């Protein structure tokens, strides 16, 4: 009974607009567990929240829970099956974590607390992120309650690419570990969706390989179980995100990757072709096509429609050797 009271005291349940506005006025950092009515708040995270609240202090860190269907402000999170945690400081949304990942949650909490502390100490200007910057250039939800048309909200200017954690890596329980490595490498996951891809989707996805003997095997593998679909961007450095992601993946053949790029994802998690754990779009054109196929509501920024600097010059010089050109997987 005592533990139950601690849980209630730890997380304030927000079920009205008034309570939501009261939360926005709180000092320090507030982490809101957005949940669906049919599953309730994410209880496995309570012990982490209790630990961090004790370590950080009651004044600087607060926790709340809110059912997505009860508040208009949470409309875009309605019907999402994975837990979503929203981070608010000074009444503004500053971070979003999707999924029950205690390591990532703890890291994000500490980062946001440190950022919040530095502003008054260094005399800097507080910059609140927008929903579009945190969740990506997405037309989400696909319709508005007032019946109006959604505009292109790709205002962040970030270029994006597609990543897929394939069924073989998911089946071996490596998905969350791979996601952590992706984030540690400086990539931002704008959207993550776990689902089993359909045969029709994969036939369209790999249509450029339809005449190859490996086509049916590849399609069957990609439809054999759940995959994690990722929309990725990169905020650090000047390298195009498509190129950066391909480099991070390593060569398509895991055996080649282990020899030439042992730190790459395919070297660490791939076994043999076609079980190379992760997919990356080959170039900007492929990224746009693949994103449009698997995320039909995705809205491209102007930068996504442009080739990265130097791409035209590279094409004029001649064909570029790409060990993945034949496989494109």
From Swiss-Prot:
The keyword Lyase does not apply. Residues 11-115 form the Thioredoxin domain. GO terms for biological process: CTP biosynthetic process; GTP biosynthetic process; UTP biosynthetic process. Expressed in lung airway epithelium (at protein level). One of its GO terms (cellular component) is cell projection. SUPFAM superfamilies: Nucleoside diphosphate kinase, NDK, Thioredoxin-like. Gene3D superfamilies: Glutaredoxin (3.40.30.10), Nucleoside diphosphate kinase-like domain (3.30.70.141). Keywords: Cell projection, Cytoplasm, Cytoskeleton. PANTHER family: NME/NM23 FAMILY MEMBER 8, THIOREDOXIN DOMAIN-CONTAINING PROTEIN 6. May be a regulator of microtubule physiology. Belongs to the NDK family. Monomer and homodimer. This is Thioredoxin domain-containing protein 6. It comes from Mus musculus (Mouse). The gene is Nme9.
């Amino acid at each position: 009974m005592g533990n139950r009271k601690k849980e209630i005291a730890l997380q304030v349940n927000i079920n009205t607009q008034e309570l939501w506005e009261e939360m926005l006025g709180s000092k320090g950092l507030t982490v809101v567990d957005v949940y669906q009515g049919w599953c309730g708040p994410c209880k496995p995270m309570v012990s982490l929240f209790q630990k961090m609240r004790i370590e950080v202090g009651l004044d600087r860190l607060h926790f709340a829970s809110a059912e997505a269907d009860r508040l208009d402000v949470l409309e875009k999170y309605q019907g999402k099956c994975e837990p979503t945690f929203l981070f608010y400081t000074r009444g503004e949304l500053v971070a979003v974590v999707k999924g029950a990942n205690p390591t990532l949650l703890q890291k994000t909490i500490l980062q946001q607390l440190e950022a919040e502390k530095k502003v008054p100490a260094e005399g800097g200007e507080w910059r609140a992120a927008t929903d579009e910057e945190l969740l990506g250039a997405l037309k989400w939800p696909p319709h508005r309650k007032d019946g109006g048309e959604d505009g292109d909200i790709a205002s962040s200017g970030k270029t994006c690419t597609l990543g897929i954690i394939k069924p073989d890596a998911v089946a071996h329980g490596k998905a969350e570990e791979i996601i952590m490595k992706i984030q540690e490498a400086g990539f931002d996951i704008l959207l993550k969706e776990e689902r089993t891809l359909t045969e029709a989707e994969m036939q369209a996805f790999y249509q450029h390989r339809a005449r190859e003997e490996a086509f049916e095997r590849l399609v069957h593998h990609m439809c054999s179980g759940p995959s994690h679909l990722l929309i990725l961007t990169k905020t650090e450095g000047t390298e195009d995100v498509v190129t950066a992601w391909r480099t991070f993946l390593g060569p398509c053949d895991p055996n080649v990757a282990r020899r030439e790029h042992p730190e790459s994802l395919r070297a660490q998690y791939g076994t043999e072709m076609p079980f190379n754990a992760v997919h990356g779009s080959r170039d900007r054109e492929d990224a746009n096509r693949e994103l449009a196929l698997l995320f039909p509501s995705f809205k491209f920024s102007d930068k996504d429609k442009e080739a990265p600097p130097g791409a035209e010059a590279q094409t004029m010089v001649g064909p570029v050797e790409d060990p993945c050109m034949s496989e494109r997987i």
